[in-house]
């Protein structure tokens, strides 16, 4: 109505980039399941979680893996560890309160990035990435499956996984919102 477009959630994967037409040729325009293969067994390379803290203008104040964080000091990023500074994350939120902190949350975003090969996509050799911020839905689903297979078998490299997306409905009272959940 006002001419603005807003992002909408989908229950299918949307490829982007130079090789998107090859993805669409392999899976069609609205695939809800794709087969992927991890090229490495190292979680930090193929199933990496990152914590980010941004100010209200979108500036990246701090980021890290949950143990080591890089914090902007006004001129450069300086590395700190949770082992040395156990209250580091809360301290950053106190020093740089953003909208989320003012609304009663911790202000941090958790981002999961998967790096994988899609065997069905012919004509390109390389890895694809998928990123999600679904901290209480998609991230635990994917991470728990990845960790369980890695623990059970000792490796994930070369195993064909189904990466799925489907809508879930909120279980909160008086909230019938739908959101996509990705699972492995």
List each model region and its residues.
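OB-fold ssDNA-binding interfaces and closely related basic DNA-contact patches used
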Residues: 1-121, 174-179
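Extended serine/threonine-enriched, polar tracts that run as long, contiguous segments within proteins
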Residues: 101-184
């Amino acid at each position: 109505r006002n001419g603005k477009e807003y992002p909408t959630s989908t229950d299918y994967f949307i490829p982007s980039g130079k090789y998107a037409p090859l993805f669409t040729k392999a899976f069609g325009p609205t695939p809800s399941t794709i087969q992927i293969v991890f090229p490495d067994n190292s979680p930090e390379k193929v199933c990496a979680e990152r914590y980010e803290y941004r100010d209200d203008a979108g500036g990246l104040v701090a980021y890290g893996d949950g143990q080591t964080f890089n914090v902007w000091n006004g001129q450069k990023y300086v590395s700190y560890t949770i082992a040395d500074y156990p209250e580091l994350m809360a301290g950053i939120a106190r020093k740089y309160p953003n909208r989320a902190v003012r609304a009663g949350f911790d202000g941090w975003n958790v981002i999961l990035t998967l790096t994988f090969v899609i065997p069905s996509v012919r004509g390109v050799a390389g890895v694809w990435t998928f990123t999600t911020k679904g901290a209480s839905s998609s991230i635990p689903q994917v991470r728990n499956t990845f960790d369980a297979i890695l623990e059970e078998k000792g490796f994930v490299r070369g195993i064909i996984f189904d990466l799925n997306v489907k809508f879930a409905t909120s279980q909160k009272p008086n909230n019938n919102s739908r959101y996509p959940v990705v699972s492995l």
